[in-house]
Amino acid sequence: MADVAGTSNRDFRGREQRLFNSEQYNYNNSLNGEVSVWVYAYYSDGSVLVINKNSQYKVGISETFKALKEYREGQRNDSYDEYEVNQSIYYPNGGDAHKFHSNAKPRAIQIIFSPSVNVRTIKMAKDNSVSVPDDYLQRSHPWEATGIKYRKIKRDGEIVGYSHYFELPHEYNSISLAVSGVHKNPSSYNVGSAHNVMDVFQSCDLALRFCNRYWAELELVNHYISPNAYPYLDINNHSYGVALSNHQ
């Protein structure tokens, strides 16, 4: 495999195991098939950023890492030190967390999402302009060219999620995705009164932007959400920023 993130083949094998564990963690804890998206960004200095968003609970990046830390240590896999948990960064092979390049860019993206999510569009940003390189999309994003071809994550014969890994061209520093989903079991929610079909359908636009090495922004915009049907959602607060350090 290409040395995308500046790590060795051994690191990539360990990475695959970490991805497998994180997938199992994600879907062991899924709730009624809600819209859930996990994004793993692999930087050129070997660090890994993990972001999770779902439509029912807003999971903070630090809380996400603590949960993954507990799960992976239970599996006797790579553990996370306190610095990595607090800074929301994972360094492979116990690398020195203080030694990274300030100009590091994401070189590969892993997207893991629940069965209720459909990836609609992919956009990439070069510098400050947004463009869609058709030839690259056809090569690396088969659902854009030939239909849905993700890796299926199954348990007891049932599809519990999808996973897709792709590499980013060196000249691109940002990626934007539009996703949508519908709850598998909308009747499980206590809506209290009659609602039209739009009250049980949720569409989300997920935008993941890498502004620089220290800052990534994940924006989740919800459409067609009834406050009565979804009282737990703060529909007035759509944008979230995840600071990787004090630098911006």
UniProtKB/Swiss-Prot annotation:
Give me the glycosylation sites of this protein.
N28, N77, N86, N237
What GO terms fall under cellular component here?
A: viral occlusion body
- Keyword annotations: Glycoprotein, Late protein, Viral occlusion body
* Transmembrane regions: none
Residue ranges the record marks as coiled coil: none
Look up the domain of life of the source.
Viruses
On subunit structure and binding partners, the annotation says: Forms crystal-like bodies by self-assembly.
Function according to Swiss-Prot or TrEMBL: Major component of the virus occlusion bodies, which are large proteinaceous structures (polyhedra), that protect the virus from the outside environment for extended periods until they are ingested by insect larvae.
Q: What is this protein called?
A: Polyhedrin
Organism (species):
Lymantria dispar cypovirus 1 (isolate Rao) (LdCPV-1)
Query: What does the organism's lineage look like at the top?
Result: Viruses, Riboviria, Orthornavirae, Duplornaviricota, Resentoviricetes
